[in-house]
């Protein structure tokens, strides 16, 4: 079972992602947060395998999902199984500059929000397996 934390400032998006991904037999949504500042604490508490991060989220310590990915990498965050926590950026902004920043911050993948549910689930599986998704 792949343990997933959702981080998006829009509650409707978080709940829709949780509902869709919850239909996958090998994915478990372990938590949801609405700001970059909540990500580190939630990861420390819930120890997910993969964190889905929106790029633009409110926060004072962590200004966006890309900064949250870098903070998780720098903190050496680990999952319940002891493996490094992987991050997947999920955003409406598919511009090359965002992709480059995300990968430089240690994100394992980058997908746009108009990706289908099956493709997103597969991206989570690939990121969990240590592969890069762009």
Where are these regions (language model features)?
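Conserved active-site segment of CheY-like receiver
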Residues: 9, 90-94, 114-115
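Short amphipathic alpha-helix used as the core "switch/output" element in two-component signaling
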Residues: 41, 63-83
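Conserved acidic segment of CheY-like receiver
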Residues: 1-13, 17-21
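Active-site residues of response regulator receiver
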Residues: 54-55, 91
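Alpha4-beta5-alpha5 switch/output surface of CheY-like receiver
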Residues: 64, 95-98
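C-terminal output helix
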Residues: 97, 115-128, 132
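Acidic, metal-coordinating helix/loop segments flanking the phosphotransfer/catalytic sites
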Residues: 32-50
């Amino acid at each position: 079972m792949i343990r997933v934390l959702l981080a998006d400032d829009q509650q409707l998006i978080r709940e829709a992602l949780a509902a869709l991904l919850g239909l996958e037999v090998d994915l478990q949504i372990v938590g949801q947060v609405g700001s970059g500042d909540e990500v580190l604490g939630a990861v420390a508490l819930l120890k997910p395998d993969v964190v889905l991060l929106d790029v633009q989220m409110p926060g004072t310590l962590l200004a966006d999902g890309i900064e949250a990915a870098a903070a998780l990498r720098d903190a050496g965050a680990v999952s319940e199984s002891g493996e490094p926590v992987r991050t997947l950026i999920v955003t409406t902004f598919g511009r090359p500059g965002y992709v480059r920043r995300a990968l430089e911050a240690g994100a394992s993948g980058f997908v746009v929000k108009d990706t289908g549910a099956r493709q997103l689930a597969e991206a989570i599986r690939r990121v969990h397996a240590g592969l890069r998704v762009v």
